């Protein structure tokens, strides 16, 4: 073989080697690209899930804040109710002199101002007298026989007023019910 033929053969072998290496290099790069695409897809999925979780947390916090604002006077209302009961008991006392009447008038004014303040905060008395008994709003402490005037499950007497804040019962009405 001549030198020229040897050189051509050598070049041919090198080209075949380069072609083989190039093909395997392209295959490696294609595999790498697929792996990177899969990883990117996984990261996008994680990102979307994290974003959704943050949105859910934000909504949950917003709802909790709204509930806190809506029911902020619940504890205060529960603490004031015994004082209202005492003022109402004081109003029930019979007085015979002018000084007693004056004192009773002052108590009435205080009771009225507290009642107005509670209404402004959303705290209201639960209607009970003559109403149909509702175990969600009333607590029956005694029963009496029903009559023609008072049908069964009717409240005949209120022993202690009940109060509610918006749709929550702060204290049920303690009542006597006809059975």
From Swiss-Prot:
InterPro entries: GrpE, GrpE_coiled_coil, GrpE_head. Participates actively in the response to hyperosmotic and heat shock by preventing the aggregation of stress-denatured proteins, in association with DnaK and GrpE. It is the nucleotide exchange factor for DnaK and may function as a thermosensor. Unfolded proteins bind initially to DnaJ; upon interaction with the DnaJ-bound protein, DnaK hydrolyzes its bound ATP, resulting in the formation of a stable complex. GrpE releases ADP from DnaK; ATP binding to DnaK triggers the release of the substrate protein, thus completing the reaction cycle. GO terms for biological process: protein folding. GO terms for molecular function: adenyl-nucleotide exchange factor activity; protein homodimerization activity; protein-folding chaperone binding; unfolded protein binding. GO terms for cellular component: cytoplasm. Pfam families: GrpE (PF01025). Homodimer. Residues 1-10 have a biased composition (Basic and acidic residues). This is Protein GrpE. Keywords: Chaperone, Cytoplasm, Stress response. The keyword Chaperone applies. Gene3D superfamilies: 3.90.20.20, Head domain of nucleotide exchange factor GrpE. It comes from Enterococcus faecalis (strain ATCC 700802 / V583). Residues 1-23 are annotated as: Disordered. Belongs to the GrpE family. It is found in: Cytoplasm. NCBIfam families: PRK14140.1 (NF010738), PRK14156.1 (NF010753), PRK14162.1 (NF010759). The keyword Chaperone applies.
């Amino acid at each position: 073989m001549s030198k020229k033929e040897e050189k051509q053969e050598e070049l041919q072998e090198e080209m075949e080697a380069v072609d083989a290496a190039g093909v395997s290099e392209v295959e490696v790069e294609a595999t790498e690209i697929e792996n990177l695409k899969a990883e990117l897809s996984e990261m996008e999925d994680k990102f979307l899930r994290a974003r959704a979780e943050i949105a859910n947390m934000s909504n949950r916090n917003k709802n909790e804040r709204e509930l806190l604002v809506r029911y902020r006077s619940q504890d205060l209302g529960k603490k004031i109710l015994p004082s209202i009961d005492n003022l109402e008991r004081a109003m029930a006392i019979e007085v015979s002199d002018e000084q007693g009447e004056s004192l009773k008038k002052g108590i009435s004014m205080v009771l009225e101002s507290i009642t107005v303040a509670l209404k402004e905060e959303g705290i209201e008395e639960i209607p009970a007298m003559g109403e149909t008994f509702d175990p969600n709003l009333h607590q029956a402490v005694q029963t009496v026989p029903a009559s023609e005037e008072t049908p069964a499950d009717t409240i005949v007497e209120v022993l202690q007023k009940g109060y509610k804040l918006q749709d929550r019962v702060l204290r049920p009405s303690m009542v006597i019910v006809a059975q």
